[in-house]
Amino acid sequence: MSDTNNPGDKTQTRAPSKPLTLKRPVEQGTVRQSFSHGRSKSVVVETVKRRTIGAAPGTVAPREPVAAPPPRPASVAPAPAAPARPAGRSASGVVLRTLSEQERDARAAALADAQRREAEARARAEAEVKARRDREEAERREREAAEARRREEEERRRQEDELRRKAAEDSRRRAEEEAARAAAAAPVDEAPAEAPAAPAPVAEAAPTVAPTPAPAPRPAPAPARPAAAAPAARPGAAPQRPAASGARPGVAGARPAPTAARPAAPQAPAEPRRTITADVKKPRDLNFMARPAPAPEPEKAPSPTTAARPAGTAARPAARPGAAAAEDESDTKRVIRRPGMPLKIITPPKTPKSPGGDRNRGRLTIANATAGEDERTRSVASFRRRQQRMSGHRHEEPKEKIARDVTIPETITIQELANRMSERAVDVIRLLMKQGQIHKITDVIDSDTAQLIAEEMGHTVRRVAESDVEEGLTSDEPDLEEDLEPRPPVVTIMGHVDHGKTSLLDAIRRANVVEGEAGGITQHIGAYQVAAPSGDLITFIDTPGHAAFTSMRARGAKVTDIVVIVVAADDGVMPQTIEAIQHAKAAGVPMIIAINKIDKADANPQRVRTELLQHDIQVESMGGETLEFEVSAKTGDGLPELLEGLQLQAEIMNLRANEKRDGEGTVIEAQLDRGRGPVATVLVQRGTLFTGDIIVAGAEWGRIRALIDDTGKHIPYAGPSVPVEVLGFNGTPDAGDRVIVVPNEARAREVTEYRARIKRERLNARTGGANRSLVDMMREAKEGANRKELPIIIKGDVQGSVEAINGALTALGNDEVGVRILLSGVGGITESDITLANASKAVVIGFNVRAHKEARNAAERDGTEIRYYSIIYDLVDDIKATLSGMLPPTLREERLGEAQILQIFDVSKVGKIAGCRVMEGVVQRGAHVRLLRNDVVIHEGKLAQLKRLKDDAKEVTAGYECGMSFQNYQDMRVGDFIECFNVEEIKRTL
């Protein structure tokens, strides 16, 4: 919108797009502001001289400020031409009344906006406090509180919508009233002023200003203002132009002469201060802080300057573009009128707010400090501190409880339990203290206690066991009938030592294993396959018969199908024979009795049958069901019949297996070979083992590198009932471990790590590991103070032999002496073994193994003893003799005689000497003596001197008198008896 000026018009013309600039006398200075944390900033301060503006003529009712209405045009009648301007201008001819009124309106609107924004900020803060209280209440009733917040939000929105709607109605009504007043006040150059209208009602729910009277029509312009009352001319303003010759009738010539005196207009009453509520307050923007804001003035009808404007000149708009830009977007619509055009209501364009427009609303300037409109608003630093405090309160808000699914193993530490629940460990310890338990965060609790704690804290518990890693490792599903095929029987030969078990097996295999065994006794468990006369294969397992190999015999009975009990015809049933019978009964396998050595002259097979009846074994020849065969390993008599009986028993048992499934078996024996590494003798029981399979045996795993049968040949696979040597384990497994094929290495590592951990825990529990309390250690130290121990390190050739040695040596000893095995393993003696033995003063025992060169050198340097054995008998006997030498001897007293004290003599440099008479027996010098007083032992020691008269005597017999003195004792009295005796030491044995 632009102004069209006639040649006679001297008013200022401005483009709407240019901002309003005022050239004032300005003084500048600097002020240093201090902020928190030692920060400061220099600020340029402008000092502007305050301009005094005279009061407007006429009595005008104050304007009623309302909320910003939505744009809505109003239809009004066109306004007549403005009357001629009176002579009320300044010496420079600049019109200032309209400009100052617009400026005051803009500043009043800016103040209202600032107060409204500040009120909204306070309302938001109050809403945040209320929301925080609601969240605290929502800990117990979360759903109800959430529903309440939702209803509250809906109510607040509804109220805001209602406020906006009513504010829009008020604004529309006000705009219509202003338009009507503007239309009525156009031809008022000589019309009398109308009475003020009644006050307009205020909307019910609108939180706006207090009710004020509605504006009345402006009165007729006054004749003239005094020259002294004219405000200073605005710099840069154009002089007022004279009226054009083509003015409308009644308008031209209506302007009085500039020098004509005009009666002074009545002074306008002071505008009542508007009461700004919380909803209309907003922070001040930059336009307000740039210059001092005048007090808001009441609205007026079109000024005489505008009314008296000559015809042909477009009427000045009611709101200048520069002033409109300074007003908030909530201002009411403007009413403008152009010559020859209908009256229009124009809504000023909305100025978009910049993101940081309100950032500097609290900056201190001279103009801001001297304005006096309102108290100084909050600074940026203060606002930031308030935001930080609010954010800190939000951080202190209690977090909502989150129920989690907690997985609890069999044992768990308090710290780990707290981490899984996302709780504090101190809270867990506090709950345990309520239950009467005192713990640290590193203590281990059981699964029941952990479940109780987790449920107490509102979590869901899912209990698992560490052994779950072994689930699915073996399949218990029965095999299909079409997959089952006959397999060879597994026969275990058991019996007493030297009853001919290995010789019998050699005769069947046509081999000579006995000569290869040290001492002619079996110290390893062996597995072989033999072809029966019918051509079928039979798998034999040879077990030791020595008492130390009980565990070997038990393993052999568990993996077998048939047990052959070998009994010598000349010895009969012996202790290990009875033990073998018990193992077979415990395993639930059928037994066959082989009566060996029938070729001897003193053989008595019938005595063997009779002795077996004492152990509930009735052979067929005596009406029972147990098969018995008389055989001779030396001559080979009865061996074919024995093999036929084994084949018949296998057919009765209908032994079948599935070769198509993954292989499973049992470790019969294991050893550490220096060239091949860990080697395990495995008996395959189900499925088939292939080269390259990943297998797990106890706490060891590996990939099969090679399969070797009993004849030493490499085979690609091994089926059911086939004994093979397996190479490829990463460690030596224990004899009796289950061998299982797993799909991948990850699964193998998972299983073996769990088993190794369980193995360590059991070892610590058995030897007293880290879980022992101080009381336990003190009790054990007290109990073991008088017990002597022999530390030993054992290295053997195979796992079974080492196990047998451990069992035999552990059984030795009593409460006074015993064996403490520091280390036992398979393989040669290494330098680390010597180092351990030197540190603990232990003896190193090698069973069928030798020490490495480095180990020998270290043993010679440190003086460590290494003993080599190949027969378990010799090893056990030597250790037993060593323990016997550690036993304290038995003391036995031999009474010599008795004497009575008759007189006490004091001898210088000697002390007291007792004059005695030997009552019975003999008293010897250097013998042990015991002083008795009233049949109570007063002292026990040794005789220091023995004299007969004045000569030293070796002994004094009964009836003679002598003098005696004791070692380190002088309290002797007349009438005491002295008993003389000798102490004899007797060597003890285990």
Curated annotation (Swiss-Prot):
Biased composition (Basic and acidic residues): 114-180, 271-285
Disordered: region residues: 1-400, 464-483
UniProt-annotated stretches for the region G1: 495-502
Record's compositionally biased regions (Basic residues): 383-392
Top-rank lineage group of the source organism: Bacteria
Region span, G5: 632-634
Domain tr-type G span(s) in chain numbering: 486-656
Cellular component terms per the entry's GO annotation: cytosol
Keyword GTP-binding set for record: yes
Annotated positions binding GTP: 495-502, 542-546, 596-599
Listed name of the protein: Translation initiation factor IF-2
Organism listed in the record: Methylorubrum populi (strain ATCC BAA-705 / NCIMB 13946 / BJ001) (Methylobacterium populi)
